[in-house]
UniProtKB/Swiss-Prot annotation:
Pfam families: SQHop_cyclase_C, SQHop_cyclase_N. InterPro entries: SQ_cyclase_C, SQ_cyclase_N, Squalene_cyclase, Terpene_synthase_CS, Terpenoid_cyclase/PrenylTrfase. GO terms for molecular function: beta-amyrin synthase activity. Disulfide bonds: none annotated. The gene is bAS1. GO terms for cellular component: lipid droplet. Oxidosqualene cyclase converting oxidosqualene into beta-amyrin, generating five rings and eight asymmetric centers in a single transformation. Required for the production of soyasaponins and glycyrrhizin. It comes from Glycyrrhiza glabra. This is Beta-amyrin synthase. Pathway: Secondary metabolite biosynthesis; terpenoid biosynthesis.
Length: 765
């Protein structure tokens, strides 16, 4: 039986931590673990997901919940409430629903104070890790039988009805993910016609029906070339010389978005080496299975520009194709021949590897994310198969693996700090401090211990890194990468908790550490007034024309984001109230400029585009929270009036909101089909309207929304898992299972706190 371990480093000599592994979450399999009843509970959850996999595609993330609720001896003792047709919501009924949710959320907290969760959904995360272990000869040790069984379960359970796999679990089938998952099944032991429900044969038919793997996007071409299923001649060049360009050039890596930089860093190393893994009998079979013509007859030069229409979200501009062709025809032949291969290429490869080692060390070999992790790990193995760097990478592989009722997948990294920041704020909004004091104290401790205490090591600016001291990451302290909205939410938590008695919630954070957080936020505001996420924005927007991926948008340079801006305004307004003397003028200017950015980026229909959640509902909640914190109201701010109109217009008949993930790639509001509502979207919209003062004008829409949330609450006090709610890079969705626990409760807590409600009459006898 699978068991989640919390804050454990294990006995591996190649793993280390900056804070004794606080927030670390890893899974282990115990063949003798669990009672027959507990095993039956897991089997039932798996069967239920499988039977309903085409109706609700995100998992409920139930395995760790079963374990933690059992360990914490949780049993919901507060009776459920429902609101009938025509019935008013009373303060008492709202309180009951909030208490049930708060007690359940408290029971889900782990010993170190955080809330674990899957954060996955993209179907291209896991296969490259399997490829890497296959190439390096560590497949059996990293993925023994039970691991393989769960990986295959995940692949089977998320195969679309047409036989393919989408870019993410709710998406239409794509060549990229269908080919990757097909190869993954074959590496894990399935035959050409093997797999549950004829998975392999159906996938291969989909691939052939859509032109074969020559039509896989550029990232797929790279991985297939590394495996030896493709030829490097079929990939566009990724010259490592990029890393020795003069810094004044506009396309210098220092000007790139950090994730783009850290993907192409190891990719360019592997490309520069023209590395190819062992050509095994399986690789030769795959060459026969995946193409629509004999491998020897493939026109690799033509294949470079081929991409299946199902994968094509961002078509390459002509300028970009001309650049690739120039590099392919003229530059690469020169750089791969003497003397340039010795004078230039070797130096470029050495510099590239220096950057890879730096990024690995400063993230404790977690690396910035899962795509980058696998590429950097493979690059380290190519450099030295027996080196310590590769061994340190292997020690951190378990940090990325997650097991749910739908099988084992690879996390993007972790959302420990992100989820904890919102969970603590939601719990604070309940005003049930005495009932949940231990939960708040543990959450406070986790947040304080997770703050990044230092900047990246050494001369970090020469390694294209920004300050991180005082920030919070998305996951844990070891990860090391500052994020503006994570920092803002962490800062808000510490400030709010500092206003409560320390004997209840623990000692407040030292002012100097709060000042460090403020410094990070101030450093990330752009000239436009908006906040970037990881590093300062400012590179030329035209560089996006060089976006080499076909399925993402806006990935080349850092941008400003509505959510980061809204979060930062709220945090700094509260900080200014509690510490009025610290950098007063700078903070006032920051808030004024950030408000201007929010007003300038509002769309014509009154909404804001959400970059990290679905989508206009999500962005509008953050924007309205920021504007309200800065003193803007319905009366004095046209942007708020327009936003209120948008939210009221999109409310459903049942009182809820439901927005399709298609809003994100299409960049227009798309409602869920069938007039469905989603409790998480409803919570965001309800809180947005409360920020906008809707209770003072007409509370009826708020009552309708609250009724839907209350009536959707489950027996244990949580809410059902519905559609996927997270997104990144416009076109790929992320699954945040904790959102269904946090946001409906938070919205009800704000509703109970800020909307006047009648009390139930007391009958005197």
């Amino acid at each position: 039986m699978w068991r989640l371990k919390i804050a454990e480093g294990g006995k591996d000599p190649y793993i280390y931590s900056t804070n004794n592994f606080v927030g670390r979450q890893t899974w282990e399999y115990d063949p003798d673990g669990g009672t027959p009843e507990e095993r039956a509970q897991v089997d039932a959850a798996r069967l239920h997901f499988y039977n309903n996999r085409f109706q609700v595609k995100p998992c409920g993330d139930l395995l760790w919940r079963f374990q933690i609720l059992r360990e914490n001896n949780f049993k919901q003792t507060i009776a459920s409430v429902k609101i009938g047709d025509g019935e008013e919501i009373t303060y008492e009924k709202a309180t009951t629903a909030v208490r049930r949710a708060a007690h359940h959320l408290s029971a889900l907290q782990t010993s170190d104070g955080h809330w674990p969760a899957q954060i996955a959904g993209p179907l291209f995360f896991l296969p490259p890790l399997v490829f890497c272990m296959y190439i390096t000869g560590h497949l059996d040790s990293v993925f023994p039988e039970e691991y393989r069984k769960e990986i295959l379960r995940y692949i089977y359970y998320h195969q679309n009805e047409d036989g393919g796999w989408g870019l993410h679990i709710e998406g239409h089938s794509t060549m990229f993910c269908t080919a990757l998952n097909y190869i993954c099944m074959r590496i894990l032991g399935e035959g050409p016609d093997g797999g549950q429900d004829n998975a392999c044969a159906r996938a291969r038919k989909w691939i052939h029906d859509h032109g074969g793997v020559t039509h896989i996007p550029s990232w797929g071409k790279t991985w297939l070339s590394i495996l030896g299923v493709f030829d490097w001649c079929g990939s566009n060049p990724m010259p490592p010389e990029f890393w020795i360009l003069p810094s004044f050039l506009p396309m210098h890596p220092a000007k790139m978005w950090c994730y783009c930089r850290l993907v192409y860093m190891p990719m360019s190393y592997l490309y520069g080496k023209r590395f190819v893994g062992p050509i095994t009998p399986l690789i030769l079979q795959l060459r026969e299975e995946l193409f629509t013509e004999p491998y020897e007859k493939v026109n690799w030069k033509k294949a470079r520009h081929q991409c299946a229409k199902e994968d094509l979200y961002y078509p390459h501009p002509l300028l970009q194709d001309l650049i690739w062709d120039s590099l392919y025809l003229f530059t690469e032949p020169l750089l791969t021949r003497w003397p340039f291969n010795k004078l230039v290429r070797e130096k470029a490869l050495q510099v590239t590897m220096k950057h890879i080692h730096y990024e690995d060390e400063t993230s404790r070999y977690i690396t910035i994310g899962c795509v980058e992790k696998v590429l950097c790990m493979l690059a380290c193995w190519v450099e030295d198969p027996n080196g310590d760097a590769f061994k340190k990478h292997l020690a951190r592989v378990p940090d990325y693996l997650w097991v749910s009722e739908d099988g084992m997948t690879m996390q993007s990294f972790g959302s420990q700090e992100w989820d904890a920041g919102f969970a603590v704020q939601a719990l604070l909004a309940t005003n049930l401090v005495e009932e949940i004091a231990p939960t708040l104290a543990k959450g406070h401790d986790f947040i304080k211990k997770s703050q990044v205490r230092d900047n990246p090591s050494g001369d970090f600016k020469s390694m294209y890194r920004h300050i991180s001291k005082g920030s919070w990451t998305f996951s844990d302290q070891d990860h090391g990468w500052q994020v503006s909205d994570c920092t803002a939410e962490g800062l808000k938590c510490c400030l709010l908790l500092s206003m409560l008695p320390p004997e209840i919630v623990g000692e407040k954070m030292e002012p100097e550490r709060l000042y460090d957080s403020v410094n990070v936020l101030l450093s990330l505001q752009s000239k436009k007034g908006g906040l970037s996420a990881w590093e300062p924005a400012g590179a030329q927007e035209w560089l996006e024309l060089l976006n080499p991926t076909e399925f993402f948008a806006d990935i080349v340079v850092e941008h400003e984001y509505v959510e980061c801006t809204g979060s930062a305004i709220q945090a700094l307004v509260l900080f200014k109230k509690l510490y009025p003397g610290h950098r007063k003028k700078e903070i006032e200017n920051f808030i004024a400029n950030a408000v201007r950015f929010l007003e300038d980026t509002q769309t014509a229909d009154g909404s804001w585009y959400g970059n990290w959640g679905v989508c206009f509902t999500y962005g509008s909640w953050f924007a309205l929270g920021g504007l309200a914190a800065a003193g803007k109201t319905f009366a004095n701010c046209a942007a708020i009036r327009k936003a209120v109109k948008f939210l009221l217009t999109t409310q459903r008949e049942d009182g809820g909101w439901g927005e399709s993930y298609l809003s994100s790639p299409k960049k227009i509001y798309v409602p869920l089909e069938g007039s469905r509502s989603n409790v998480v979207h409803t919570a965001w919209a309800l809180m947005g309207l409360i920020h906008a003062g809707q209770a003072e004008r007409d509370p009826a829409p708020l009552h309708r929304a609250a009724k839907l949330i209350i009536n959707s609450q489950l027996e244990e006090g949580d809410w059902p898992q519905q559609e996927i709610t997270g997104v990144f890079m416009k076109n790929c969705m992320l699954h945040y299972p904790m959102y269904r626990d946090i946001y409906p409760m938070w919205a009800l807590a704000e509703y109970r706190r800020r909307v006047p409600l009648p009390s139930t009459p007391v009958c005197l006898t």
